[in-house]
Amino acid sequence: MVSEEYKKAGVDLEKLRNYHNMISQIISSTYKNTIIGAGHYSGVIKIGSLNIAMHTDGVGTKTFLALQTRIIKPVGIDCVAMNVNDLICVGAKPVALVDYIALERPMDNVVNEIIDGIVQGAKEADVEVIGGETAIMPDVIRGFDLSCTAIGVVDKLKTGAEIRPGDYVLGLESSGIHANGYSLVRKLIEEGKLSLDEYKNELLKPTKIYVKPILEVMNMIKGAAHVTGGAFSKLKRLTSYKIVLNMPDPPQIFKTIEKAGVAHEEMYKVFNMGIGIVLFVSEELMKEVKTKLEGYGTVYELGRVYNGNGITIKTYKNEILRL
């Protein structure tokens, strides 16, 4: 599955997958106490009697738009969200994180806003920020870069291994684009097809943090998939069974981006299309899980799991897309 528009914007997803596969093979030679290695949402290692999950991630080129608009704080929240949302996808309760901020030049207000965002996100996720690193590297960085590394404690692993045909697929609404697809968005802005001034508030909305709702139903679900880079293809990490999804009408910002010049099919390969996290749950528990989650926002009954393989998506335009 090659995202051609994303590739033209400078992000070759196929190359990235090749890098991931190569790196995974090389680093596997270090595994001794590793329970889940590279390739899932988070790595898990056994330390004493504890299963510790660890994940590192950044916010990508959303930082460029943050700097252009001077709307900085949301990317601090994004950085927390991108990490803790991946930790919960292996069954972990996030507990702590450290941050890394790299600057092209000293930018006092930018650093303050980033840290304010990280702290706000950390409080929402109930994690402690226990340190970090700040660097000024004018020969390396353009603007600023931001990443976090988070750890969590796993009581019971959630890898998707228990998913079976007949299970339901639920989706929790996203707050917007979250932190993926921004190289493509920036390309549209640079080409004059999308107005940054008009849509800056939508484009800079922070990623929704799903820790509280997912922890509430963790013992009732079979798996969770954070919809980030690669969009719905990420569901293949959890199961090889066939997944059929009937996607809801997405928020207007996605339609605006599509109208600006992104192919309809491409939208579902790059963006979350209004769904931030996907859950797999048995038929017996589906209604109870859905009811518990409705206090945290809109919950969609997206589809089911079947015998077979691959992912079939019915888009909001009633077109059929196979991943």
Curated annotation (Swiss-Prot):
It comes from the Archaea. Keywords: ATP-binding, Cytoplasm, Ligase, Nucleotide-binding, Purine biosynthesis. Pathway: Purine metabolism; IMP biosynthesis via de novo pathway; 5-amino-1-(5-phospho-D-ribosyl)imidazole from N(2)-formyl-N(1)-(5-phospho-D-ribosyl)glycinamide: step 2/2. It is found in: Cytoplasm. HAMAP family: AIRS. It catalyses: 2-formamido-N(1)-(5-O-phospho-beta-D-ribosyl)acetamidine + ATP = 5-amino-1-(5-phospho-beta-D-ribosyl)imidazole + ADP + phosphate + H(+). This is Phosphoribosylformylglycinamidine cyclo-ligase. Signal peptide: none annotated. One of its GO terms (cellular component) is cytosol. The keyword Transmembrane does not apply. Its main location: cytoplasm. SUPFAM superfamilies: PurM C-terminal domain-like (SSF56042), PurM N-terminal domain-like (SSF55326). Belongs to the AIR synthase family. It is an enzyme of class 6 (ligase). Its EC number is 6.3.3.1. It comes from Saccharolobus solfataricus (strain ATCC 35092 / DSM 1617 / JCM 11322 / P2). GO terms for biological process: 'de novo' IMP biosynthetic process; adenine biosynthetic process; purine nucleotide biosynthetic process.
